[in-house]
């Protein structure tokens, strides 16, 4: 798996990373796993399933909520992470080191808009920035997530 710096992020909090063999590894962002809380169940897509970009293809559940996972690209599901199936809580321990499934797609074309890691961090801070701006009238503050907005 490549470095998190090469990951592409969807605004729906999936990350995707294309490996040298052309397969696209998919997981969820750290922000998503923190918002979910303790992950207890992962309903994976079906192996060999054809998926369309943006389609809800899997579900991840915690004690607090359930969330759809969307396909960042169109293609075929060619691998499922059996470790996550057996121990879904692994997603909480290492969200950028644990992939959920792999999609076979030779060219990585993402659902608009996708962002690099830095741009994604800015999106995460956006709601806090608006709340803080209204309350204190200042544009540059650190959000509760600890990122400079």
Curated annotation (Swiss-Prot):
- According to its UniProt record, which protein family does this protein belong to? Belongs to the GcvH family.
Q: Which InterPro entries match?
A: 2-oxoA_DH_lipoyl-BS, Biotin_lipoyl, GCV_H, GCV_H/Fam206, Single_hybrid_motif
What cellular component terms from Gene Ontology apply here? Answer: cytosol; glycine cleavage complex
What's a GO biological-process term for it? glycine decarboxylation via glycine cleavage system
Query: What is the originating organism of this protein?
Result: Polynucleobacter necessarius subsp. necessarius (strain STIR1)
Name the keywords, alphabetized.
Lipoyl
The cofactor note from the UniProt entry for this protein is:
Binds 1 lipoyl cofactor covalently.
**Can you name this protein?**
Glycine cleavage system H protein
Outline the extent of the Lipoyl-binding domain: 23-104
On the tree of life, the source organism's domain of life is Bacteria
Q: Which Pfam families match?
A: GCV_H (PF01597)
**Tell me, what does this protein do in biology?**
The glycine cleavage system catalyzes the degradation of glycine. The H protein shuttles the methylamine group of glycine from the P protein to the T protein.
Q: Which gene encodes it?
A: gcvH
Q: Which cofactor does it need?
A: (R)-lipoate
**Residues with the N6-lipoyllysine modification:** 64
Fetch the NCBIfam families from UniProt.
PRK01202.1
Asked if the Swiss-Prot or TrEMBL record annotates the protein with the keyword Translocase, the reply is no
On assembly, the entry states: The glycine cleavage system is composed of four proteins: P, T, L and H.
């Amino acid at each position: 798996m490549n470095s998190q710096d090469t990951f592409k992020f969807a605004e729906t909090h999936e990350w995707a990373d294309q490996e040298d063999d052309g397969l696209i590894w998919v997981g969820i962002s750290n922000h998503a796993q923190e918002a979910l809380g303790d992950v207890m169940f992962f309903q994976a897509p079906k192996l060999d399933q054809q998926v369309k970009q943006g389609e809800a293809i899997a579900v991840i559940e915690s004690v607090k909520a359930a969330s759809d996972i969307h396909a960042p690209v169109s293609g075929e599901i060619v691998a499922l992470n059996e470790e996550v199936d057996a121990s879904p809580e692994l997603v909480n321990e290492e969200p950028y080191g644990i992939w959920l499934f792999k999609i076979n797609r030779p060219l990585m074309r993402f659902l608009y808009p996708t962002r690099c890691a830095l741009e994604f961090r800015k999106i995460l801070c956006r709601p806090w920035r608006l709340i803080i701006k209204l309350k204190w009238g200042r544009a540059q503050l650190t959000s509760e997530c600890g990122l400079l907005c």
